[in-house]
């Protein structure tokens, strides 16, 4: 027994007989960890063997009891040299385990503590009944049992459960018999009670009839019991139990109806201890309505039985009773006018760091009666637009700010340099070891130095210093210094004076000198000694500037790189000597490579212009004071993201100074330079820095608590002193001190969501750096950073005294908020770019084309439509938008590509005339290409001009051209024609980059930006974060809790991006900072385009956005045109062969059985998916108008399924008459007799899914008008089901392109298949595709089976689509050839007669670059060997092997070497 252990036994008065037992003979205390803040002591004991259970219990009880008397909590564990696995000892310790947390939860203890254990096959086996041998107990409790046995001294045991059938049956039998006994007892009790009642009743003649069973009274009794029942925390439920009562919030609801008409409400609730799945049944609609209170966000009390759901296999409450309860949200209890203003709040736009939306932040502040609230996201202002709109709505001032990353422009290598020859100087290279990073709160424990001259050590200094307290385990672990090193150490003042003498007449040198010098100066100042004034060289900055190509410049990496010995890193003497050796290497390289000989040159000639990239970041809060400040803020954000981005957006101090007008600065959090100075350098240094700012921030002590864990501050008292020091800094610098909350979430219970988000970043993130080392090392806890009310903040700062707390929390924040003006973040008008004579050009182009087609004078219907549209377009300043689109389309046309239109632009006849869209929105009509005579059908009898019968012009006999889709202009620019036009265009994917550059060319580089987007954490991603958090931090959550945590963690900004085709154009009479900052997408500083910092939707009503999207259809059409020489414009839209594809397969020369589908829709854009092919099979369209209907029906929401489909099946309506596209509603209702304005309004309500959301009075007015004009009821009911509708102009553009592609499939099939595989096919399997029909059909069958079993991969699903087309092509008599080393193209399929030759990229794993390299190499000569193919062709060994297996390489040898036999044969 060690002396220390014996002393402890004396203190706890351990019985002598136990102390003298063999168990204690070699007992020792390995380690004691003391946690001063929490008053917890952890003992780690060593024994020769596991203690007898009685001895263990005695030791445990006496240890706990003795230390409890001193208000100290104790835990201990044991390491035993020998372990006894006898069943009796294991059984005794097994039962003991349930007396210790965390094995003593009620459900675990009650279910497991009485079970028997045995030791078999190196495992502790628990014999358990089957109903508790489940994953829940294995996952949630067995790990705790393993840990407890390890603490008992058994080492790491493997513990498992086995089901004991006999026990299961016995317990089940006991349960049944017990329940039966209870039932029988209840019956007997009722009989006894009945007899007692009868005995008390009056004589028979006076008897009254026996009272009937009062159902209402029984319900009332049950309800009363429900009201009074104890609430069970959800976290305590771990097994099936009856009549449990929960209270909590509903966060997910799903209602289902069974085939029998019963309803199931599946919902999830949380009480913030955990979450639970619940289920409530309702027998019919009437009963279902009683449970309308089960809604997302509702607070409920529920009672029911906990059972294992047979489908989800998780515990679920079957709800018997439910009641809505009042949940009392936190309130700000201070009177009006005495409420604080929050000046430091993050929203979910703070990347992977904060949770609240800006709307919820502002709403909470407004609800609490705060007059203002600030937004200070990390380095971005992406929440500004939404914050601006919400604040105006809520009637509260939004203060727009950010928490910036401030850096010095140039970080000096030398401090206080003088004119001195570096070669002749004497250097004192020193290092200090400390108990922490704070010079004000931590202590020096070692100073060591090497005095060096011309590379030689001439004298050394090495002294330990006693800090006056035991060293922490963290300090010892980091530095290697123990309390023994400090036993005979000199006093601090003595060492400081000696070191000052040692340093005279020298240049001081240290690695990361700002820390070492700062620590020394703080100690000099504390002891009234002169601070350092001589020159200092920082070897960290020296290395960064001398060797910028190195990624790491720490002392360890540098000594390894330069082969300098560093045996004991983090002991000052070794570090100082190593730093000295490095110094002279650096001086030599600086002299030889940069000509640096004088100390002054280090900063002037060596410090790089971009040294800000390596500078230490300090946080500052920047606020917009006025409109000038807003623009400067936008400029700063842009510069930090574009010019000064390095890991994070940085703002150099001089850049901030240049744009400071209209901005106010706060000192931010513990990462700010003023706070850092208070902690590391003292109040005087902090005052000097504070003068740069407009106010000093202090935060609640709880926010600074992680600094205690990191040993930067000693304890709570230390935190409070730092806050007092900051207030003193404000007083001396004459700066107001504001108490801010550093808000990262709104409610205290939301802390876990941020924890999950932050920990998902991994240990590479600074916030997740672990404290200490080893497997058990954990990151510092995150601070309690919820949005605090005024009274909560006053409580946090109560230690300052009532008056001072009120001043910093309320008065100063209100006064500072008053200094800030209201600003306009989002402009109220549209600012279009300027193009000279845009209005005249649009009008001229429109009439020029109209005259060309329809003659001059124009038909009245054309003339009036043009006049109406131009009045709107020119009058509202939209001409430049039209002209810009026309210029882009025209340029792409000139490069040989068609451009398809999207959206409703085809509703504009002006857009048609100037060439933006091919869709003609006029009523169906004939027009003569020779004499321009025209005929218009305006009665609605024809849906599309393409469906008109062919006929000659009655005037000149020339065959008429047919056109017109009958689309009103109102669907594009609104009824009054003043809606900002949104022109979306489908360019060929091949030509899209050129089209984007066209925008720059037209408007200028400085005015064209990609439309920015913000990517947030999706719920599925958040789910992964939660599961990762479970794994990494030893948590176990039930499924409902995982769902809640994932939902809470979702929505946080993760990255930025760009719209695939959106280009924002800034007017050339303004600059981009009038609207938004700019940045690179996803922080990719190599990107060729800058994006808007704001999500483009936030400013889409202020600036022009051009949607220049890439699409396969124009690419496909261009490919077909190149192959055939046919101009796609000349392809008729009513080709009989093409239309025949929609009714059968005969036109393809195959049967439905051969190609597996009854029509010829495979591979036709818009109509080739399984869903639309099914619609075609049901409706059998025969006209272009019906194809438009199909397109609208397939793209809408609740337009086909459960709506038009049923009407057609039941014979109520036809494909022609159902509602298909949004525009059809307005046209149909006008033809029915409704006023255009009402027809338009009804269309708008229906297409946006608002029909059932508008007031009943408004809806009934529309219904009455429709019925008055004989609109059938089925039509009205159909309107009520629709959620979203497709524009007819969009459908027309898509269908027109589709029919052109289909034309080639019918009339030029090999060209069609060549284009399809070159452009549309997503997956290839060449071995199958070139293997013939049998191979193709077999593979399709294989994938079909996998699909049925949900086993098919995404690649296989894509491959199936490809194989469908291959199968069709082969069935039509064409062939699919093999890859040919000398004939295949790199990326395009080739036509050889009736055979398609695949390109190299069709081979799995072979990319475009390798394909092109092979083509280039074969032009230089034949490949003589596989080695040569790999070398010259760039193909990997795997690809060459794959080619060989497919027979592509023939008999190609492995290498070029000729064998002996080649000379003879």
Curated annotation (Swiss-Prot):
InterPro entries: DNA_pol3_alpha_NTPase_dom, DNA_pol3_finger, DNA_PolC-like_N_II, DNA_PolC-type_N_I, DnaE2/DnaE/PolC, DNAPol_HHH, DnaQ, Exonuclease_RNaseT/DNA_pol3
Subcellular location(s) of the protein: Cytoplasm
Gene3D superfamilies named among the record's database cross-references: 1.10.150.870, 3.30.1900.20, 6.10.140.1510, Metal-dependent hydrolases, Nucleic acid-binding proteins, PolC, middle finger domain, Ribonuclease H-like superfamily/Ribonuclease H
Keywords linked to the UniProt accession: Cytoplasm, DNA replication, DNA-directed DNA polymerase, Exonuclease, Hydrolase, Nuclease, Nucleotidyltransferase, Transferase
Signal peptide: none
The enzyme's E.C. designation: 2.7.7.7
The Exonuclease domain, residue ranges: 427-583
Role: Required for replicative DNA synthesis. This DNA polymerase also exhibits 3' to 5' exonuclease activity.
Entries under PANTHER family matching the protein: DNA POLYMERASE III POLC-TYPE, DNA POLYMERASE III SUBUNIT ALPHA
Family: Belongs to the DNA polymerase type-C family. PolC subfamily.
Protein's UniProt name: DNA polymerase III PolC-type
Provenance organism: Streptococcus pyogenes serotype M2 (strain MGAS10270)
């Amino acid at each position: 027994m060690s002396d220390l252990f014996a002393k402890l036994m004396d203190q706890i008065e351990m019985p002598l007989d136990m102390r003298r037992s063999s168990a204690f003979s070699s007992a020792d205390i390995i380690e004691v960890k003391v946690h001063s803040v929490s008053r917890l002591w952890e003992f780690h004991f060593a024994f020769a063997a596991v203690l007898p259970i009685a001895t263990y219990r005695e030791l445990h009880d006496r240890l706990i009891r003795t230390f409890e008397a001193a208000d100290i909590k104790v835990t201990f564990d044991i390491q035993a040299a020998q372990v006894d696995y006898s069943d009796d000892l294991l059984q005794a310790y097994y039962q003991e385990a349930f007396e210790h947390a965390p094995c003593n939860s009620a459900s675990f203890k009650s279910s497991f503590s009485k079970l028997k254990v045995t030791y078999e096959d190196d495992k502790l086996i628990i014999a358990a009944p089957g109903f508790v041998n489940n994953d829940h107990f294995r996952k949630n409790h067995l790990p705790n049992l393993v840990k407890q046995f390890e603490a008992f001294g058994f080492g790491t045991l493997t513990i498992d459960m086995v089901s004991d059938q006999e026990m299961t049956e016995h317990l089940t039998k006991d349960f049944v018999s017990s329940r039966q006994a209870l039932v029988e007892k209840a019956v007997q009790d009722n009989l006894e009670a009945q007899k007692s009642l009868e005995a008390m009743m009056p004589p028979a003649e006076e008897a009254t009839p026996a009272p009937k069973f009062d159902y209402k009274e029984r319900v009332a009794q049950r309800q009363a019991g429900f009201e009074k029942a104890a609430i069970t925390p959800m976290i305590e439920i771990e097994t099936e139990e009856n009549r449990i009562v929960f209270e909590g919030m509903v966060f997910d609801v799903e209602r289902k109806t069974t085939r029998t008409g019963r309803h199931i409400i599946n919902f999830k609730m949380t009480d913030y201890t955990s979450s639970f799945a619940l289920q409530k049944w309702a027998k019919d609609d009437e009963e279902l309505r009683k449970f309308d209170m089960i809604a997302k966000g509702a607070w409920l009390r529920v009672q029911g039985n906990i059972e294992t759901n047979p489908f989800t296999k998780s515990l679920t409450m079957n709800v018997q009773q439910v009641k809505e309860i009042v949940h009392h949200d936190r309130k700000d209890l201070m009177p009006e006018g005495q409420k604080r203003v929050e000046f430091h709040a993050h929203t979910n736009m703070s990347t992977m760091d904060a949770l609240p939306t800006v709307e919820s932040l502002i709403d909470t502040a407004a609800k609490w009666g705060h007059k203002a609230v600030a937004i200070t996201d990390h380095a971005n202002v992406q929440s500004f637009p939404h914050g601006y709109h919400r604040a105006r709505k809520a009637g509260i001032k939004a203060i727009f700010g950010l928490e910036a990353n401030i850096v010095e422009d140039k970080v000096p290598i030398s401090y206080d340099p003088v004119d001195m020859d570096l070669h002749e100087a004497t250097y004192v290279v020193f290092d200090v070891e400390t108990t922490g990073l704070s010079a004000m709160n931590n202590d020096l424990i070692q100073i060591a130095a090497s005095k060096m001259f011309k590379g030689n050590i001439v004298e050394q200094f090495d002294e330990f210093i006693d800090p006056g307290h035991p060293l922490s385990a963290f300090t010892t672990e980091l530095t290697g210094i123990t309390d023994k090193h400090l036993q005979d150490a000199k006093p601090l003042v003595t060492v400081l004076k000696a070191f000052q003498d040692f340093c005279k007449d020298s240049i001081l040198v240290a690695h990361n000198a700002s820390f070492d010098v700062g620590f020394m100066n703080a100690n000099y100042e504390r002891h009234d000694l002169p601070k350092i004034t001589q020159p200092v060289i920082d070897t960290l900055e020296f290395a960064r500037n001398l060797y910028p190509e190195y990624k790491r410049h720490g002392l360890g990496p540098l000594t390894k790189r330069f082969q300098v010995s560093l045996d004991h890193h983090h002991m000052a003497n070794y570090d100082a000597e190593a730093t000295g050796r490095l110094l002279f290497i650096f001086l030599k390289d600086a002299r030889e490579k940069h000509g640096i000989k004088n100390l002054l040159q280090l900063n002037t000639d060596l410090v790089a212009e971009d040294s800000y990239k390596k500078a230490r970041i300090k946080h500052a809060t920047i606020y917009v004071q006025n409109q000038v400040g807003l623009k400067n803020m936008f400029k700063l954000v842009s510069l930090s993201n574009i010019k000064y981005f390095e890991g994070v957006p940085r703002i150099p101090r001089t850049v901030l100074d240049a744009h400071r007008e209209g901005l106010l600065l706060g000192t931010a959090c513990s990462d700010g330079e003023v706070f850092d100075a208070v902690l590391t350098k003292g109040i005087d240094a902090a005052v000097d820095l504070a003068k740069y700012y407009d106010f000093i921030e202090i935060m609640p002590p709880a926010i600074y608590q992680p600094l205690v864990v990191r040993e930067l501050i000693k304890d709570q008292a230390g935190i409070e002193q730092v806050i007092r020091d900051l207030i003193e800094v404000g007083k001396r610098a004459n700066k107001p001190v504001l108490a801010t909350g550093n808000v990262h979430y709104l409610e205290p219970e939301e802390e876990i969501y941020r924890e999950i988000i932050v920990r998902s970043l991994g240990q590479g993130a600074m916030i997740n750096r672990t404290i200490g080392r080893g497997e058990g090392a954990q990151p510092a806890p995150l601070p309690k950073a919820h949005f605090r009310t005024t009274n909560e903040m006053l409580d946090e700062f109560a230690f300052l005294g009532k008056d001072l707390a009120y001043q910093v929390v309320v008065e100063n924040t209100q006064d500072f908020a008053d200094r800030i003006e209201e600003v306009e973040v989002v402009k109220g008008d549209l600012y279009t770019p300027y193009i000279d004579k845009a209005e005249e050009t649009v009008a001229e182009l429109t009439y020029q084309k109209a005259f060309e087609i329809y003659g001059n004078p124009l038909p009245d219907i054309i003339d009036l439509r043009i006049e109406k549209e131009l009045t709107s377009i020119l009058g509202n300043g939209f001409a430049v938008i039209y002209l810009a689109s026309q210029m882009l389309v025209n340029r792409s046309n000139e490069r040989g590509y068609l451009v398809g239109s999207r959206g409703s632009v085809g509703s504009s006849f002006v857009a048609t005339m100037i060439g933006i869209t091919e869709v003609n929105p006029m009523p169906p009509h004939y027009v003569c290409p020779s004499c321009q005579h025209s005929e218009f059908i305006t009665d609605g009898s024809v849906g599309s001009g393409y469906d008109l019968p062919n006929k000659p012009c009655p005037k000149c006999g020339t065959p008429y051209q047919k056109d017109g889709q009958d689309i009103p202009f109102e669907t594009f620019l609104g009824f009054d024609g003043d809606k900002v036009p949104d022109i979306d265009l489908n360019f060929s994917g091949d030509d899209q980059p050129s089209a984007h550059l066209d925008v720059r060319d037209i408007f200028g580089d400085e005015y064209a930006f990609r439309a920015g987007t913000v990517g947030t954490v999706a719920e599925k991603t958040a789910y992964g974060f939660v599961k990762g958090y479970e794994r990494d931090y030893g948590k176990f959550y039930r499924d409902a809790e995982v769902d809640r945590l994932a939902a809470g963690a979702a929505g946080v900004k993760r990255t930025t991006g760009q719209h695939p085709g959106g280009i924002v154009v800034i007017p050339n009479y303004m600059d981009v900072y009038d609207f938004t900052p700019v940045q690179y997408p996803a922080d990719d500083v190599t990107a060729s385009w800058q994006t808007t910092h704001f999500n483009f939707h936030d400013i889409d009503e202020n600036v022009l956005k051009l949607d220049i999207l890439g699409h396969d259809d124009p690419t496909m059409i261009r490919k077909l045109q190149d192959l055939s020489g046919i101009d796609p414009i000349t392809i008729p839209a009513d080709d009989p062969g093409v239309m025949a594809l929609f009714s059968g397969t005969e036109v393809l020369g195959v049967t439905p059985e051969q190609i597996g589908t009854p029509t010829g829709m495979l591979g036709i854009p818009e109509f080739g998916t399984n869903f639309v092919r099914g619609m075609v099979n049901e409706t059998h369209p025969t006209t272009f108008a019906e194809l438009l209907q199909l397109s609208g029906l397939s793209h809408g929401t609740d337009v086909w399924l459960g709506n038009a489909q049923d009407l057609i099946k039941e014979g109520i309506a036809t494909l022609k008459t159902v509602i298909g596209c949004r525009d059809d509603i307005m046209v149909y209702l006008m033809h029915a007799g409704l006023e255009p304005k009402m027809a338009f309004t009804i269309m708008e309500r229906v297409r946006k899914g608002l029909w059932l959301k508008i007031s009943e009075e408004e809806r009934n007015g529309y219904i009455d008008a429709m019925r008055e004009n004989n609109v059938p009821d089925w039509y009205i009911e159909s309107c009520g089901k629709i959620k979203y509708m497709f524009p007819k102009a969009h459908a027309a553009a898509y269908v027109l392109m589709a029919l052109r592609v289909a034309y080639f499939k019918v009339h030029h099939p090999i060209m069609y298949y060549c284009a399809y595989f070159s452009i549309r096919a997503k997956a290839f399997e060449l071995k199958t595709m070139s293997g013939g029909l049998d191979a193709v059909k077999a593979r399709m069958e294989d994938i079909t089976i996998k699909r049925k079993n949900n086993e098919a991969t995404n690649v296989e699903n894509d491959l199936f689509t490809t194989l469908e087309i291959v199968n069709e092509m082969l069935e039509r008599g064409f062939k699919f050839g093999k890859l040919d080393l000398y004939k295949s193209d790199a990326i395009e399929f080739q036509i050889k007669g009736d055979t398609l030759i695949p390109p190299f990229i069709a081979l799995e794993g072979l990319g475009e670059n390798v394909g092109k390299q092979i083509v280039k190499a074969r032009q230089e000569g034949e490949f003589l060997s596989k080695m040569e193919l790999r070398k010259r062709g760039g193909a990997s060994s795997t690809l060459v092997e794959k080619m060989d297996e497919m027979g592509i390489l023939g008999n190609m040898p492995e290498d070029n070497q000729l064998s002996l036999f080649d000379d003879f044969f």
